[in-house]
């Protein structure tokens, strides 16, 4: 067999063993995809005993390409909600997640100075302690730039030592916070539901009867509140007739307006217009119907809603827009992206015409445009290779193969499309590429570090490294958890999701979800902090490496 064939067979063996190990669970918690790392260590141990070696250049390429695939698809997945999470109600949660990352970096700095651990070892321990594989790849790249030899193998070994408690430490933190504050989960869920009912930001509807005589004869757009674009009027009932109003529709007393918007905005509109009435207009007889359609027509990508002309031509109004799971109030200036889900209302005989303009071709949602994928990867690698010179630093700072593709993917996913190119990727395709990438990366890391793993654990400093990893995992989580609960009064279920998301750890999310099944509270906060946390986890080892290198 050729060297390439042998290498591929070994990688396949590592993946099979590792994924099998990852499926082992103790009380519902397992290593997950991290099992591939230990599969690589096991195979490498026996390869080392039998004197079998693989081509280093081939392994290096596979490792880097796997990392690029993983971080790029992560960026495409979380990009649409990344910038929104920084500006919306997730600001507090993202601030706490940032605190966890900063405290972790401080812990690394303290350990490096106090116990005099080698730079490659402490960065490997850090990546394992926070259970973040792209962090490992970013650290390995910057250490190679600094000229540290054997950084790949030693960092991988240290990562493997710290990884198991990295998972267990998150779960232990959740349990101790619950014990310390004597938290009752049922009450936490009720409090969250009550608070979310008062401050809910998702869209809702209300029917308001016009009783304010000052509004009679005004155009719809001239009513105070509609100019803020926070509320949409999707239907108007006048006597027994239901129609789709336009901005120029003249309002009369006793008209019933079907409004869509956030609760606080709707409350203000009711004060201006009149009284709320219990009249489900969606069930009234008439020639109107509503549909949910998906933007798939390449010709409308990037176009503003006002330029579609579907209201003037067909009397159709867009009442809601769902983008990457986030509901938005559409305005005339909202630009459409591939995969946007629109809730439209119009006459039965014309709504089909509007649908054909927007697309709604379900088969396109299952197709992957490969050209944008490779454009994005290429741009990401180029960005990651650009040096940033900072006075006083011994080497130029780079985003690297972990940071560059991630940043580009976040930006492209936020843009959505350029001309006929769109960066939407079906969830199944995204997951497949992401899993292939991380399996390849972890398999090679395990193979590179596994030769001396057992010897380091039994006869070397393996147990010490585990202890350092526990410190880096546990201290930031507990400090932030106590601050969030004691001073910021954060809901416990949201706090559990925050802890799991700040460590970008799916097994911890599974544990948090199991605390109160079917609530979805932990998953919501996890998704809120995950994008920023992933970005910070990739950048932090590079900054730590340069700062600690200059302090040597």
UniProtKB/Swiss-Prot annotation:
PROSITE patterns linked: RCK_C (PS51202)
Transmembrane helix listed as a keyword: yes
Source species, domain of life: Bacteria
Residues of the RCK C-terminal domain: 190-275, 277-360
GO biological process, one term: potassium ion transport
Listed SUPFAM superfamilies: TrkA C-terminal domain-like
NCBIfam families according to UniProt: PRK03818.1, YidE_YbjL_dupl
Protein name (record): Putative transport protein HS_1470
């Amino acid at each position: 067999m050729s060297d390439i064939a042998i290498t591929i067979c070994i990688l396949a063996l590592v993946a099979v063993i590792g994924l099998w190990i990852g499926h082992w669970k103790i009380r519902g918690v397992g290593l997950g995809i991290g099992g591939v790392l230990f599969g690589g260590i096991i195979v490498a141990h026996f390869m080392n005993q039998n004197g079998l070696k693989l081509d280093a250049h081939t392994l290096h390429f596979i490792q880097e390409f796997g990392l690029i695939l993983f971080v790029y698809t992560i960026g495409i997945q979380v990009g649409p909600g990344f910038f929104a999470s920084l500006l919306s109600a997730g600001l507090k949660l993202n601030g706490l997640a940032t605190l966890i990352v900063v405290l972790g970096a401080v812990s690394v700095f303290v350990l490096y100075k106090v116990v005099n651990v080698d730079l490659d070892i402490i960065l490997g321990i850090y990546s394992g302690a926070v259970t973040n594989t792209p962090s490992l790849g970013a650290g390995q790249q910057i250490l190679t730039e600094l000229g540290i030899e054997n950084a790949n193998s030693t960092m991988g070994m240290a990562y493997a030592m710290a990884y198991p408690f990295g998972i267990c430490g998150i779960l232990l933190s959740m349990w101790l916070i619950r014990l310390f504050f004597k938290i009752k989960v049922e009450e936490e869920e009720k409090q969250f539901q009550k608070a979310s009912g008062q401050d809910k930001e998702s869209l809702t509807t209300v029917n308001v009867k016009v009783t304010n005589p000052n509004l009679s004869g005004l155009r719809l757009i001239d009513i105070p509140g509609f100019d803020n674009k926070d509320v949409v009027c999707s239907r108007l009932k006048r006597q027994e007739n239901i129609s789709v109003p336009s901005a120029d529709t003249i309002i009369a007393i006793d008209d019933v307006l079907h409004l869509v918007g956030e609760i606080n905005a709707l409350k203000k509109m009711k004060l201006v217009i009149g009284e709320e009435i219990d009249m489900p207009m969606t069930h009234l007889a008439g020639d109107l119907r509503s549909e949910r359609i998906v933007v798939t027509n390449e010709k409308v990508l990037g176009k503003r809603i006002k330029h579609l002309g579907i209201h003037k031509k067909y009397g159709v109004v867009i009442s809601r827009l769902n983008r990457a799971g986030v509901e938005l109030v559409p305005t005339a200036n909202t630009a459409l992206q591939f995969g946007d889900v629109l809730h439209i209302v119009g006459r039965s005989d014309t709504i089909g015409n509007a649908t054909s303009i927007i697309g709604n071709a379900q088969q396109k949602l299952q197709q992957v445009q490969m050209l944008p994928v490779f454009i994005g990867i290429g741009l990401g690698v180029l960005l990651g290779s650009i040096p940033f010179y900072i006075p006083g630093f011994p080497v130029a700072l780079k985003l690297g193969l972990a940071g560059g593709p991630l940043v580009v993917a976040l930006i492209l996913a936020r843009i959505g499309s350029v001309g006929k190119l769109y960066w939407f990727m079906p969830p199944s395709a995204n997951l497949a590429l992401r899993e292939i990438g991380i399996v390849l990366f972890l398999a090679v890391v395990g193979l590179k570090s596994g030769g001396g793993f057992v010897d380091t654990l039994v006869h070397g400093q393996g147990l010490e490294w585990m202890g350092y990893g526990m410190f880096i995992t546990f201290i930031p989580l507990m400090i932030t958890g106590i601050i969030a609960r004691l001073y910021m009064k954060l809901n416990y279920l949201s706090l559990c999701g925050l802890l799991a998301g700040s460590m970008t750890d799916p097994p911890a999310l599974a544990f948090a979800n199991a605390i109160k099944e079917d609530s979805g509270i932990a998953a919501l906060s996890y998704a809120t902090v995950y994008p920023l946390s992933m970005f910070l986890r990739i950048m932090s080892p590079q900054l730590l490496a340069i700062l600690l290198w200059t302090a040597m």
